[in-house]
Amino acid sequence: MSTLSGRRAVITGGAAGIGAAIARSFAAEGAHVVIADRDAAAAESLATELGGESWEVDLLAVASLESLSLEADILVNNAGIQRVAPIESYEPEMWRRIHTLMLEAPFLLIRAALPGMYERGFGRILNLSSVHGLRASAFKSAYVAAKHGLEGLSKVTALEGAPHGVTSNCINPGYVRTALVEAQIADQAKTHGIPEADVLEKVMLTEAAVKRLVEPEEVASLATWLAGPHAGMVTGTSYVMDGGWSAR
C-alpha cells in the first residue's frame, strides 16, 4: 500500500518548483493532491497530470482566508517570494507583502485546516522554511524575519496539535534550483557589485560544504517521508538540507 494512500494534501505554490516536485511525489505515493496557486492554468495542468484538483488562490488576499474551512490531511505551506536589498532602501510595502504571504497566510491556512485534522485524529503540516529560518544573510531582512517567524509558528502548532495526532515541522533547504533562486541572481549581482556569473560561487554557495544547488526532488523526498505514517513522532523540529552551510 502506498504510504499516502487516501490522504488529501494541499500544497501552496504547488504549480512549479518545490511545490510541484512535492505534489508529484505525494501523488506517486497515493495522495489526492490539491495544487494551490495563483497561476490557475499551471495549477490545473499539473492537477490534471496527477489526477488531483487545482485551487486558484491569491494568498496575499488574506481577508478571504479568515473564514476558510480547509479539508486537508496534509498541508504544505510552500508559497514564497524574495527581495534582495539593504535595509535602508527596503520598500516597506515589499516587507509587508513578504510577511503576508510567508507568515500570515500560513497561519490562516493552518488555522483553517486544524479543526478537520483534530476531528480525524491525524494531520501533517509541513512548512517550507529555509536555512534562513535558522541563519541570517545580509540584504534579506524581510525574508529572514518571515522565515524565523514561520519556525516559531510551526513549533507552536506542533505543541497544540500533538494531543490530536497532528505534527508540524519545517524543512530548511539551502538554495534550491527554482525560478525563485534564479531570479535572485541579478539582484545579488547588483547588490554585491559582481557579475551574475559569479553569484553562485561567491555569494550563494560560499558557506555550503557541498558546492551545488539543492534539487526540488530532494526536498520532495523529505517532505513525503514527513507526511507519511513513519514520522508520527517527528514534530516541532526543523530538517536542514543545506549542504553543510549551518554546520559552520
Give short role names for the model-derived ranges.
Residues I110, A146, S154:
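Active-site helix of classical SDR
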Residues P86-I87, M94-H99, I125, M204:
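Substrate-binding pocket helix/loop in short-chain dehydrogenase/reductase
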Residues L4-H32:
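Canonical Rossmann dinucleotide-binding motif of NAD(H)/NADP(H)-dependent dehydrogenases/reductases
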Residues L114, V210-M241, S246:
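C-terminal substrate-recognition "lid" of short-chain dehydrogenase/reductases
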Residues S130:
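Residue(s) in the substrate-gating loop at a strand-loop-helix junction
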Residues E88, R135-A142, P163-H164, K211, ...:
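Active-site loop immediately N-terminal to the catalytic Tyr-X3-Lys motif
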Residues A162, T167, V234-G236:
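Short, small/polar-rich loop/turn modules that mediate ligand/substrate recognition or access, typified
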